[in-house]
């Protein structure tokens, strides 16, 4: 288990595990993370690292957080999550982050990390209590859906079928409440 603050240190300023907690090994932290074009990278910086690197006004700074994580020692980046998994598996002093689907496919070799006392589970993802679970959205506008009925049809198909398929690709389903809200918004948008 680590706190959000410790996780920010692990992925930025700490060089050795013992820099984070004195009772952890005095071994270099080996970091394996997605590339900067990844939404997973962006979300991790925003949710975990940026709060540790505020701007001059004291606000969370994504820019400062990104600079801190990119300046970390022993950092390996890859757009291929399988490469990240193999890097973490390759050393007891390695840590990484990537989509839950890649953890599930390698659960026999990897250990998940509780953050702020919350384990990554379907329940903690759904109720947003796990600090680094993130929702995925699709976006359009009412105008586009009115001008292009095929877009409206696709969005409706997606919203009414997403939970039937999403588990197969390693994502957690959206709650009934979230889906109903999206369907209500879809209805309002196409009826404008």
Q: Residue locations for each model-derived region?
A:
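Flexible loop/hinge segments at secondary-structure junctions
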Residues: 1-192
């Amino acid at each position: 288990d680590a706190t959000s603050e410790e996780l920010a240190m692990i992925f930025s300023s700490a060089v050795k595990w013992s820099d984070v907690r004195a009772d952890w090994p005095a071994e270099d932290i080996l970091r394996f993370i997605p590339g900067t074009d990844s939404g997973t990278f962006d979300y991790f910086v925003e949710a975990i690292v940026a709060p540790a690197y505020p701007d001059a006004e004291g606000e969370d700074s994504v820019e400062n957080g990104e600079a801190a994580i990119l300046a970390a020692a022993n950092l390996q980046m890859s757009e291929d999550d399988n490469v990240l998994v193999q890097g973490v598996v390759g050393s007891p002093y390695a840590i990484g982050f990537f989509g839950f689907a890649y953890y599930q496919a390698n659960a026999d070799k990897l250990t998940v990390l509780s953050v702020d006392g919350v384990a990554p589970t379907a329940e903690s993802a759904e109720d947003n209590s796990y600090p680094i679970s993130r929702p995925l959205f699709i976006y359009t506008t009412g105008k586009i859906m009115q001008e292009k009925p095929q877009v409206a049809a696709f969005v409706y198909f997606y919203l009414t079928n997403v939970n039937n398929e999403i588990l197969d690709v390693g994502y957690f389903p959206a709650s009934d409440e979230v889906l109903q809200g999206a369907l209500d918004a879809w209805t309002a948008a196409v009826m404008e």
